[in-house]
Design a protein with these regions (language model features):
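Short loop segments at secondary-structure junctions
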Residues: 106-108, 147-149, 174-178, 191-194, ...
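A short core secondary-structure module
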Residues: 159-197
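Buried hydrophobic positions in well-ordered alpha/beta secondary-structure cores of metabolic enzymes
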Residues: 78, 153-155, 187, 217, ...
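Short beta-alpha junctions and helix-cap segments that line functional grooves
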Residues: 156, 199-203
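Alpha-helical interface subdomain recognition
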Residues: 2-77, 253-292
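Glycine-rich flavin
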Residues: 43-53, 58-161
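Conserved hydrophobic/aromatic beta-strand scaffold that supports enzyme active sites
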Residues: 141-143, 168-172, 186-188, 214-219
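Glycine-rich beta->alpha junctions and the first turn(s) of the following alpha-helix
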Residues: 204-292
Length: 292
């Protein structure tokens, strides 16, 4: 390995270690409200604010935009910590990272939004899944049409994390004039876009605080496609496969891994501390437990 490559790898390792250490340092604070967030379906605003204060909301963005330019490994390890501390916060964070990375890579001219996102001043998310498409989140029945005033969007999106609470949404719809569910175009819609409404509530175990709800679009106007459209017409599927899917899979896997680790830790602590009153023995002293 050449000295220059070795130096680059060493720098990347230091950045990754710093990102993970920063995330670990606030894990207890993230976990403090996790139970209440889930029980009351409370959106983890304070946790998202804390991540922003620590400079983590731009984890994947380049340094020139205020980001950390973190590696995939640092992202996964950090998300695992966040998800294990508060599952709802973990999912909100992952969807935000996926959305802002998509905007960064495929929508020029959004430096202001991206800098705000990195600073924790702008929360973004994805709105791609639909009730009828199952795991095929890239397949869209939602439509777009050209009008005299611009482009209008119609359809419904399911499982929109941070629904009604994010500042912007990366939305997928069929390309203009297309009848194909995978010939799609992506748009960034601001939270106050006319014709965009939200409904329902999410009842996912441990994830009730992430506001993963339904987005309804009714004649939703895109007056300036040049500033709202992500990539070219019909490029949605390509962007979803190349940019969104890898980060979505890595991020959600890390969240659920963190949840599993937290559940295991809680279970171990329970058998170590639970005492049987009639014998005075702890659960972990029982043969059936020790043999597991």
């Amino acid at each position: 390995m050449s000295p220059s490559i070795a130096a680059k790898d060493s720098t990347a390792d230091l950045v990754a270690a710093d990102v993970v250490a920063t995330t670990s340092s606030i894990a207890a604070r993230l976990a403090a409200t996790a139970g209440e967030n889930d029980a009351k379906r409370s959106f983890p605003r304070e946790n998202i604010k804390l991540l922003g204060e620590k400079g983590l909301m731009g984890m994947l963005l380049p340094e020139k935009l205020g980001g950390l330019n973190a590696s995939a490994l640092a992202f996964a390890r950090s998300v695992q910590i966040i998800g294990g501390s508060c599952a709802s916060t973990g999912m909100v964070f992952v969807m935000h990272c996926c959305a802002v990375e998509t905007i960064f890579r495929h929508q020029p001219g959004q430096e202001k939004l991206l800098k705000q996102a990195a600073a924790g001043e702008h929360l973004s998310t994805l709105a791609c899944s639909e009730r009828g498409s199952g795991a095929n989140f890239y397949a869209s029945a939602s439509t777009s049409r050209q009008t005299a005033c611009g482009i209008e969007l119609n359809g419904a999106k399911s499982f929109v994390t941070s629904g009604a609470l994010a500042d912007s949404y990366v939305v997928s719809l069929r390309a203009l004039g297309s009848e194909s569910s995978i010939n799609t175009t992506l748009y960034v819609l601001e939270k106050d876009t006319p014709g965009m409404e939200f409904s329902g509530q999410w009842d996912g175990l441990g994830l009730r605080g992430n506001s993963s709800i339904v987005m309804n679009l009714k004649d939703c106007p895109v007056a300036e496609p040049g500033t709202s459209q992500v990539g070219a017409q019909g490029q949605g599927f390509e962007i979803e496969m190349s940019t969104i899917l890898p980060r979505f899979l890595l991020g959600t896997a890390a969240v659920y891994n963190g949840i599993a680790e937290a559940a295991m830790s809680a279970s171990i602590e329970h058998v170590k501390s639970r005492e049987l009153t009639h014998t005075g023995e702890k659960l972990n002293a029982m043969p059936v437990m020790r043999n597991k």
